[in-house]
Amino acid sequence: MTSRRRPRLGGLAAIAALTLALTACGGSGGGTAGGEQKSIKLVVAQYTEGTRPYWDELIKSFEAAHPGKNVDLQVIDWGNLQSQVNTMVQTKQFPDVLNINVFADYAEAGLLYRADEVVSKEVLADFLPSFADNASYDGAQYGLPFVATVNGMYYNKTILEKAGFKKPPATWDEFRAAVKAIKALPGGYVPYGLALGAEAGDYEFGTWMRANGGDWRTGGKWTVNGDRAVETLEFLKTLTQDGYTQPNPGQTNRPDGTWPLFAQGKVGMVYASFGTRAFLDAVDKAGVKYGATTHPTNHGAEPSTHGIQDYLMAFKKDGNQQLVREFLDYFYQADNYAKYLKVEGLLPTTASASTLMRKDPKVSPIVDMVAKARFDPTSQPVWSELRGTVAAELGTAVGPSGDPRAILGKFQQIAERS
């Protein structure tokens, strides 16, 4: 998500097998049998130093409003979260509510409540549709959209103005004209900072692919090597070979590659996370005049951002459903939820919190980008393996001897094994 969290973690197939086995052994009970629970366990990831103080305060106010009810909090850093959750699952010590960046394997194993079983109709309807869809498995929503980042294109206003552009390019044709003009400027500017390295090359490629009218999956089928995908990677290769990027973009990552170049005022345009301090602190400190927008589109594609989200989820346990529901409804009250997002510096997944956060003129333009978010197919079991291969090999396609169609064909074969 941002530098405050880890990327999507691997080992999902093993988790799925484990949870399925536990379910077969009766490790998950119903939510209404055995009497109503008076205490639940909440396990959350630590995003910043403000994580625990926020939850401590929220729980204190919740317990004051619900006498006799208790919420036991456990905060775990991202580096240890998945392994500790694995242990909880293996020993059948399931949390009642969990915050993590995966959910589909637990849903597949029958360990989770559906979203409509643990939040009110009002909360369920408040989730932004694209985030709710991305929290669904096999036609039902199990994950509760928790926090979001959206990614798109930042541009250096000064460089674009020098090149004769008062606004960022909106189409591929305008983009081609812009990078050509920037390259012709004195000063050795990099027209576009392209990061196709292992850190997040799939994010950048996927964003350009959607801007070209393609996607990883279309109509329920994998289209990794579809015509629009191939055209996109060929476009990025041409961009590279024509000298419109920094050297060796196939091995370039964002944090130590394109982002520092942008902060130094050397790059015209770059892919980055909207509002993330890991990117903007250095940019603001350097006094770079910048704007943020969606990537230029082709073939009339709808402008979009790349969305990434983490989830809350509720595990089925005897007697816990009512208290879980009360607590989650309390957390998702607009004021409570918006306060959390402000503490962590993250973006909303609900309409009500979006409305509140738009009152901040610095945050409002970024919040408006959330509704444009499109997502990677993270609920597909093969995605973890596919993304790992893409991360390792995608960058080779834009080298002098790279073959975009061949490399995407290899990725397609991996996807279709699912």
Language-model features and meaning:
Residues 95-96, 123-160, 302-303, 373-380:
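A structural signal for short loop-to-beta-strand junctions that line the ligand-binding cleft
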Residues 101-150, 204, 211, 289-293, ...:
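Hinge/lid segment of periplasmic solute-binding proteins
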